[in-house]
């Protein structure tokens, strides 16, 4: 078993595979945004994982990505100062003869800041460069240029077992594009910002081609908290930008509260939060699939831009929430009320 905790959001990898849990159907599920939000002057949670299936005979590699989370991210407004992230783990392996091997995090571990996760922040989003995903967590990886870790003594509280249901991307709450509008520039409508110049509109499909200089606005039909998942096919180095909003600009009129052209996403309510996902393609010939893991967004609308032509498929709004079994249901003849209930759940 693997026991892990951290100051900041962490994801663990063994032999190149992200650590998760296998359900009865053989699917791998992942606890997200570990270790969760706590009053870190007092408490931080640890998580427990059965990693038997990920270990192999001979050499094994274990590592973790750690981002700011609720420790030193913008969301806590400096509550704990600017202290660095930290990760702590203990791997217990019971051998066939009954002996137990214990592998802790200690000063023999190595670290670097040159991986594909360039930035991860609850408020400000995630920046990921897939070109830098070069097998960092595999036994064959050359870590000769990594540097030594340092012991952290910044946390003075209790480390307790995670309480409550796991935070997961819940499949039954996925949202799919209702409409996709692709536009180039704006046109005048007599208002402050004008309106977007739509060149293509797609209905009820989650794949499209986006060219450099174009912008796509995707309407998922309902607000929720979570992130976008997608598959992208394009040349290596292509940079995608995803912004998120709960509503569109309706008229393009500043006096009516809009912050951009009619049809674009409204983001002024985010105030100083960047709430943006940046993804740089590796350039896989068959496409590459991705979703962030160090942040989440409240959104119904997604705005996408690209530095070069790209094909996007399987665009899905993932709802990330407490994974609890629904014990009852509620339905009315009013669809908006049903959507409100679903959103609250």
Label every PLM stretch briefly.
Residues 1-345:
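Extracellular/oxidizing-compartment recognition motifs
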